[in-house]
């Protein structure tokens, strides 16, 4: 969004314009009275050389760059290599990672240089291209997060209204990039490169800035207000509402369109013979119970991960969004006395924007088992650890154990045919706790169901 642009020229640490620079009490700051080379050396020593805390900022940028680049590339590779991970949600996650890679490669280094040296070294052409790419990538991120929230909202809250497919997801991604590239064109038009020291403009690029040049005072205010609403506030509010409804459906109510058997009307077993085939039907129903509970747990994990991604995005972009509105719309920070503090706020806010790109792969690693396994495999390969055969054996053992587990579940319910044929569908939130003493659990235990298996089934 516009709040993250490099052209948001930071309030200078000790001045806000060339006139202020020349009007300082320090007589050395008048380039007309002293040798140009000596004057430039003074500027480098007093203003451009990184301060102590700026070295910490440089280290932070380097860490973010490495983590964001490697992490987001691994996300893309994981989905590309594994067909079972090519879900609708993962397609959008890959698109989000591509936007993060774009902003990390094209914009992060330039932002670091500008924040530290307060100088635009990259010429007029890149003055238009880099801020444009940065705003495009932010727009892509916002629209992608919105599409993810919308897709999950339909799938969980209104599954019969809209069927999401991989083809529709790919088409949506194409539309996201086209729309983002179009709506950010004004950003490239208004960017201009200028010098804060016109007297030295032909001799040095020091204190050259890349900033917006509008034809009047009203246009930038209108533009940045609309930009803040369209690329931050409005999407954030809609996504919060969507995830609130998703939370209610997944944690508080039954999911429409599913047949989650989480509580049954039962009666005590009767010593009468059961019709042939009723045992097989009971086994099938029990298998359906396990599948439905597993689906609900998987949806909860996915929703939890996406909620964390949204929360981190909102936190990382909030400071720079507020600072940008205060600066561009209300004209603050232009004549402030404590420029060092304002400068620190802007530089830290810029770093937070890029930290968001590095945070997403970390979130996937901790909250998604599939991504975590793929990350481990990728790092093992890069470190030269030959674990492919071991991974295949481990996966084979996992598959065998899963089949054995399913067989055990069915065999432990040979006499479940005594269960009533009438099944009550209700919310999983109404299920008694696994360690409780509800009648359903007691009856299962009487039928010989292991308590460990029952706890696993009823875990939420």
From Swiss-Prot:
Tissue: Expressed in the brain in the cerebral cortex, septal nuclei, hippocampus, medial thalamic groups, dorsal and median raphe nuclei, and many hypothalamic nuclei including the tuberomammillary nucleus, dorsomedial hypothalamus, paraventricular hypothalamic nucleus, and ventral premammillary nucleus. Not detected in the spleen, lung, liver, skeletal muscle, kidney and testis. Orexin receptor mRNA expression has also been reported in the adrenal gland, enteric nervous system, and pancreas.
Localization: Cell membrane
The keyword Nucleus belongs to this UniProt entry's keyword annotation: no
InterPro entries listed in its UniProt record: GPCR_Rhodpsn (IPR000276), GPCR_Rhodpsn_7TM (IPR017452), Orexin_rcpt (IPR000204), Orexin_rcpt_2 (IPR004060)
Topology in membrane: Multi-pass membrane protein
Spans through the membrane: 55-75, 89-110, 128-150, 171-191, 223-243, 305-326, 343-366
Positions on the Cytoplasmic side per record topology: 76-88, 151-170, 244-304, 367-460
Disulfide pairings: 127-210
GO molecular function: G protein-coupled receptor activity; orexin receptor activity; peptide hormone binding
Gene Ontology CC terms, in alphabetical order: nucleoplasm; plasma membrane
GO biological process, one term: circadian sleep/wake cycle process
Residues carrying covalently attached carbohydrate according to the record: 14, 22, 202
Keyword Cell membrane attributed: yes
Major location category of this protein: membrane
Keyword line: Cell membrane, Disulfide bond, G-protein coupled receptor, Glycoprotein, Membrane, Receptor, Transducer, Transmembrane, Transmembrane helix
Spans within the Extracellular topological domain: 1-54, 111-127, 192-222, 327-342
Function (record text): Nonselective, high-affinity receptor for both orexin-A and orexin-B neuropeptides. Triggers an increase in cytoplasmic Ca(2+) levels in response to orexin-A binding.
Domain comment in the entry: The N-terminal region is required for orexin signaling.
Protein name stated in the entry: Orexin receptor type 2
Source organism per UniProt: Rattus norvegicus (Rat)
């Amino acid at each position: 969004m516009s709040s993250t642009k490099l052209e948001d020229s930071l309030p200078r640490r000790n001045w806000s314009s060339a006139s202020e620079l020349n009007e300082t009490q320090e007589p050395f700051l008048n380039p007309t009275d002293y040798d140009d080379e000596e004057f430039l050396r003074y500027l480098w020593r007093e203003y451009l050389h990184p301060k102590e805390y700026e070295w910490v900022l440089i280290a932070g940028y380097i860490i973010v760059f490495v983590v964001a680049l490697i992490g987001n590339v691994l996300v893309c590779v994981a989905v590309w290599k594994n067909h079972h991970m090519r879900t609708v949600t993962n397609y959008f996650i890959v698109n989000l990672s591509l936007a993060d890679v774009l902003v990390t490669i094209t914009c992060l280094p330039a932002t670091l240089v500008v924040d530290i040296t307060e100088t635009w070294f990259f010429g007029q052409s890149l003055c238009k291209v880099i801020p444009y790419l940065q705003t495009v990538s932010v727009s892509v991120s916002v629209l992608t997060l919105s599409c993810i929230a919308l897709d999950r909202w339909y799938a969980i809250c209104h599954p019969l209204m809209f069927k999401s497919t991989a083809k529709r997801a790919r088409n949506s991604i194409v539309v996201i990039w086209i729309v983002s590239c179009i709506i950010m064109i004004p950003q490239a038009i208004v960017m201009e490169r200028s010098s804060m020291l016109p007297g030295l403009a032909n001799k040095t690029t020091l204190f050259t800035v890349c900033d917006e040049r509008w034809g009047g005072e009203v246009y930038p205010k209108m533009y940045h207000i609309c930009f803040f609403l369209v690329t931050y506030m409005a999407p954030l509010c809609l996504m919060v509402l969507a995830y609130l409804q998703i939370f209610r459906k997944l944690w508080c109510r039954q999911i429409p369109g599913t047949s989650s058997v989480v509580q049954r009307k039962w009666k005590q077993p009767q010593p009468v013979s059961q019709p042939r085939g009723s045992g097989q039907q009971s086994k099938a129903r029990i298998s359906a119970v396990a599948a439905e509970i597993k689906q609900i747990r998987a949806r909860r994990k996915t929703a939890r991960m996406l909620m964390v991604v949204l929360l981190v995005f909102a936190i990382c972009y909030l400071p720079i969004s507020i600072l940008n509105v205060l600066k561009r719309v209300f004209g603050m920070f232009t004549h402030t006395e404590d420029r060092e503090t304002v400068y620190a706020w802007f530089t830290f806010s810029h770093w937070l924007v890029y930290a968001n790109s590095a945070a997403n792969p970390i979130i996937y690693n901790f909250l998604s088992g599939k991504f975590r396994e793929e990350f481990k495999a990728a790092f093992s390969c890069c470190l030269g650890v030959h674990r492919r055969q071991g991974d295949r054996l481990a996966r084979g053992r996992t598959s065998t154990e899963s089949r054995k587990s399913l067989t055990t579940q069915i065999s432990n319910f040979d006499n479940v045919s005594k269960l009533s044929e009438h099944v009550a569908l209700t919310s999983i939130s109404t299920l008694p706790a696994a360690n409780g003493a509800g009648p359903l659990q007691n009856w299962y235990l009487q039928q010989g169901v292991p308590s460990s298996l029952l706890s696993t089934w009823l875990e939420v």
